[in-house]
């Protein structure tokens, strides 16, 4: 195992999306890059899991029923959690710029997102965490 692969294996990425197929595709991509993943079907599911301290990067849809990705990020910040976050959205015209709402917002990518852009954004997010 290379040092980079070992570092990735010790890193957990949370994926929050209400669309099963998107969540599954993102999980496959992130795992194929050597990261551990945890998936959630809603912002409320993620917040209720109480594993926020174990998450190194958060990938979240913006538009979800119950609570949006933006509302989830605001709640994380309000409760003292600072997880580098990447938003993905089917509505790029309404996407917030990096740093909006919180310096933890690293990127906002359009769906379907380019694999290389997402993986690059994860690397930026992980560097921000350290």
Per-region residue spans from a language model:
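Conserved phosphotransfer cores of two-component systems
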Residues: 50-53, 75-82, 103
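Acidic, metal-coordinating helix/loop segments flanking the phosphotransfer/catalytic sites
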Residues: 39-57
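Receiver (REC) domain active-site loop signature in two-component systems and cognate sites
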Residues: 64
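Acidic catalytic/metal-coordinating carboxylates
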Residues: 41-42, 68-71
């Amino acid at each position: 195992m290379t040092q980079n692969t070992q570092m990735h294996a010790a890193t957990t990425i949370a994926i929050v999306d209400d669309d099963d197929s998107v969540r599954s595709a993102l999980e496959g991509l992130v795992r194929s890059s050597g990261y551990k993943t945890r998936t959630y079907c809603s912002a409320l599911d993620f917040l209720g899991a109480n594993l926020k301290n174990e998450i190194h990067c958060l990938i979240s849809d913006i538009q979800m029923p119950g609570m949006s990705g933006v509302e989830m990020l605001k709640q994380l910040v309000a409760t003292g959690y600072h997880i580098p976050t990447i938003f993905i959205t089917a509505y790029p015209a309404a996407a917030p710029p990096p740093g909006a709402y919180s310096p933890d917002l690293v990127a906002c990518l359009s769906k379907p997102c380019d694999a290389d852009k997402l993986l690059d954004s994860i690397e930026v997010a992980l560097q921000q965490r350290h």
